[in-house]
């Protein structure tokens, strides 16, 4: 049974499918808010919000599962295509403003467009290779796991390395967390009510990935608060000096 084709789902899953679809819409809403917010924040702060490698991996995954192996669920199709469309804007903003973050590394700064292109191409072929190896239904989920972990770890590392909240906000963090949490919720429904195709979601590696996502994304909020407080304390100190 192909777990990617909802029409083949057992009656138990079809009974809870409307609930699963709500979580799919929640996933889409969270990520669309995140993407639009990143574009806004990028132009506001003149930087990029998502780390380079996670961004390239993410847009490559969306290309594969929006255009090459589209879901048979119209709701998922709509969510993925909308996400890909807006993510192109995220990529544009990143390419436009990334050189300002790499002035300390001229070789990288001068070749960022090529780096974005090659990284996206590399991840695109990687997602396709994974689909050829284990089938696109499984690769869809495992590829998403890789994207999520790269995004979570990359986002936290970027925040700490910059020592600044430029390109970031609580809205971006919470919308990303909403989108990813809704993904976990509808995947859980598939595991519980469609075990013929999704029993593997209870595997140690999936559970480890879930724990890592929750730990890192939860830590991001705390670290963002700390960095923001540090920025505010610097502004207050500068204000006192100017007086």
UniProtKB/Swiss-Prot annotation:
Top-tier EC class: lyase
GO molecular function: lyase activity
Keyword Cell division included in the entry's annotation: no
Pathway where it operates: Secondary metabolite biosynthesis
Keyword Transmembrane appears in the UniProt entry: yes
Source superkingdom: Eukaryota
EC number: 4.2.3.-
Record field: transmembrane: 19-39, 48-68, 78-98, 112-132, 137-157, 172-194, 205-225
Record: glycosylation sites: 111
Lipid bilayer topology: Multi-pass membrane protein
Keywords recorded for this protein, A-Z: Glycoprotein, Lyase, Membrane, Transmembrane, Transmembrane helix
GO cellular component, one term: membrane
Record InterPro entries: PaxB-like
Intracellular or extracellular location(s): Membrane
Pfam families xrefs: Pyr4-TMTC
Family assignment from sequence similarity: Belongs to the paxB family.
Function: Terpene cyclase; part of the gene cluster that mediates the biosynthesis of the indole diterpenes penitrems. The geranylgeranyl diphosphate (GGPP) synthase penG catalyzes the first step in penitrem biosynthesis via conversion of farnesyl pyrophosphate and isopentyl pyrophosphate into geranylgeranyl pyrophosphate (GGPP). Condensation of indole-3-glycerol phosphate with GGPP by the prenyl transferase penC then forms 3-geranylgeranylindole (3-GGI).
PANTHER family in the record: PTHR42038, TERPENE CYCLASE AUSL
Name of the molecule in the record: Terpene cyclase penB
Origin species: Penicillium crustosum
Gene name tied to this protein: penB
């Amino acid at each position: 049974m192909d777990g990617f084709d909802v029409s083949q789902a057992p009656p138990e899953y079809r009974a809870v499918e409307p609930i699963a679809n709500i979580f799919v819409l929640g996933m889409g809403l969270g990520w669309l808010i995140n993407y639009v917010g990143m574009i806004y924040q990028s132009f506001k702060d003149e930087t990029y919000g998502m780390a380079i490698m996670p961004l390239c991996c993410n847009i490559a995954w969306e290309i594969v599962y929006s255009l090459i192996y589209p879901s048979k669920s119209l709701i998922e199709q709509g969510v993925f295509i909308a996400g890909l469309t807006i993510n192109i804007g995220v990529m544009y903003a990143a390419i436009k403003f990334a050189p300002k973050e790499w002035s300390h590394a001229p070789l990288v700064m001068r070749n960022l467009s090529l780096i974005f292109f090659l990284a996206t191409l590399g991840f695109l072929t990687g997602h396709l290779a994974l689909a050829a190896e284990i089938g696109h239904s499984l690769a869809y989920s495992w590829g998403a796991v890789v994207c999520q972990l790269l995004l979570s770890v990359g986002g936290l590392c970027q925040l700490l390395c910059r020592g600044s909240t430029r390109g970031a906000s609580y809205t971006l963090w919470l919308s990303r967390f909403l989108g990813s949490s809704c993904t976990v919720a509808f995947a859980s429904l598939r595991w519980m009510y469609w075990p013929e195709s999704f029993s593997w979601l209870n595997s140690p590696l999936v559970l480890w990935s879930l724990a890592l996502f929750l730990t890192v994304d939860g830590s991001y909020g705390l670290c963002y608060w700390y960095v923001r407080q540090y920025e505010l304390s610097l502004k207050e100190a500068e204000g006192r000096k100017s007086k």
